């Protein structure tokens, strides 16, 4: 994997770091159509907005002249610069985070080269803003005089800056693409290497786990059987104790029933004896009352029988 990264870096350095000799600048044509900057990454889209705005500024139309005098162009260029560099930094940090699997010295070199490319792009954008600000100052100094020469010089400078900006942006773009591809491939290689190293260990662990699982299942089965036997013995013991308790309770109930019957018999005998005693108490009294009553009835009858015969004798 280290060899792969060395090859990628050498290829990139050969294609991107070579200094391009400046070619003679042709006569600037205001309003000339520029190639559009294209890209799908957020930083590329932000740079595309800066690129389009710079193309509009280079037209040096009447509206551009008015906004240059009011510093609006400089302010908008500053906002677009900050937005672009913010997106570039975020994307670079994301890419550096994906370079974990590569060697440390390679990662440091890649990070240093990306930061240098980012700094060149920022310098180009700063030069554009500085040149526009300088043009604004010069126009204000020549207020009321012709500014055609200044406009031509600004257009020429913007053309040079635009070409340098395009070159450095493409250089950064190529570096990011190459390093991202290398990071992805390095990650895949690292994952494959880790999988190859861990494969035997995983298989060994699986076999060991299966062996341990078998022994554990045997041990658990033996323990379960012993626990079952122990539980069954305990249940039988509890059943025997329960039967003994039931038999003991049945005997106690029989004793209680016998005692109740015995007490019932005794109470019945006592009641009969008490009844006989009452009878012996009241029978003489009843007989005596019957005799007295019979005597009284007899006296009354005798009195009634003698009453009619004695009355006529007294009248004579």
Swiss-Prot record:
- Disulphide bonds in the chain: none
Region: Homooligomerization; residue ranges are 265-316
Post-translational modification note: APOE exists as multiple glycosylated and sialylated glycoforms within cells and in plasma. The extent of glycosylation and sialylation are tissue and context specific.
Question: What residues does heparin bind to?
Answer: 161-164, 228-235
The record's principal subcellular location, in a coarse class, is: secreted
- Gene3D superfamilies per UniProt: Apolipoprotein
Query: What start-end ranges are recorded for coiled-coil regions in this protein?
Result: none
The places in or outside the cell where this protein is found are: Secreted; Secreted, Extracellular space; Secreted, Extracellular space, Extracellular matrix; Extracellular vesicle
Family label: Belongs to the apolipoprotein A1/A4/E family.
Q: How does it assemble?
A: Homotetramer. May interact with ABCA1; functionally associated with ABCA1 in the biogenesis of HDLs. May interact with APP/A4 amyloid-beta peptide; the interaction is extremely stable in vitro but its physiological significance is unclear. May interact with MAPT. May interact with MAP2. In the cerebrospinal fluid, interacts with secreted SORL1. Interacts with PMEL; this allows the loading of PMEL luminal fragment on ILVs to induce fibril nucleation.
What is the role of this chain? APOE is an apolipoprotein, a protein associating with lipid particles, that mainly functions in lipoprotein-mediated lipid transport between organs via the plasma and interstitial fluids. APOE is a core component of plasma lipoproteins and is involved in their production, conversion and clearance. Apolipoproteins are amphipathic molecules that interact both with lipids of the lipoprotein particle core and the aqueous environment of the plasma.
Q: What is this protein called?
A: Apolipoprotein E
Upper lineage ranks? Eukaryota, Metazoa, Chordata, Craniata, Vertebrata
């Amino acid at each position: 994997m280290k060899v792969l990264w060395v090859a990628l870096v050498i290829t990139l350095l050969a294609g991107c770091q070579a200094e391009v000799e400046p070619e003679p600048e042709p006569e600037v044509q205001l309003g000339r159509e520029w190639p559009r900057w294209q890209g799908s990454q957020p930083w590329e889209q932000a740079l595309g907005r800066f690129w389009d705005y710079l193309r509009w500024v280079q037209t040096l139309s009447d509206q551009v002249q008015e906004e240059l005098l009011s510093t609006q162009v400089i302010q908008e260029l500053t906002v677009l610069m900050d937005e672009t560099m913010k997106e570039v930094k975020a994307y670079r940090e994301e890419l550096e985070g994906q370079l974990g699997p590569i060697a440390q010295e390679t990662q440091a070199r890649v990070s240093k080269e990306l930061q240098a490319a980012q700094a060149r792009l920022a310098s180009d954008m700063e030069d554009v803003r500085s040149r526009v600000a300088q043009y604004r100052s010069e126009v204000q100094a020549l207020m009321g005089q012709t500014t055609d020469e200044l406009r031509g010089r600004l257009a020429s400078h913007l053309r040079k800056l635009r070409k340098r900006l395009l070159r450095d942006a493409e250089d950064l773009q190529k570096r990011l693409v190459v390093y991202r591809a290398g990071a992805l491939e390095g990650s895949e290689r690292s994952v494959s290497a880790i999988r190859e190293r861990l494969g035997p260990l995983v298989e060994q662990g699986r076999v060991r786990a299966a062996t341990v699982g078998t022994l554990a299942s045997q041990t658990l089965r033996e323990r379960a059987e012993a626990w079952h036997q122990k539980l069954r013995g305990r249940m039988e013991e509890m059943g025997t104790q329960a039967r003994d308790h039931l038999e003991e309770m049945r005997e106690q109930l029989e004793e209680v029933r016998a005692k109740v019957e015995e007490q019932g018999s005794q109470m019945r005998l006592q009641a009969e004896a008490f009844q006989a005693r009452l009878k012996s108490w009241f029978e003489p009294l009843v007989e005596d009352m019957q005799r007295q009553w019979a005597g009284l009835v007899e006296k009354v009858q005798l009195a009634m029988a003698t009453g009619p015969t004695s009355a006529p004798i007294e009248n004579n």
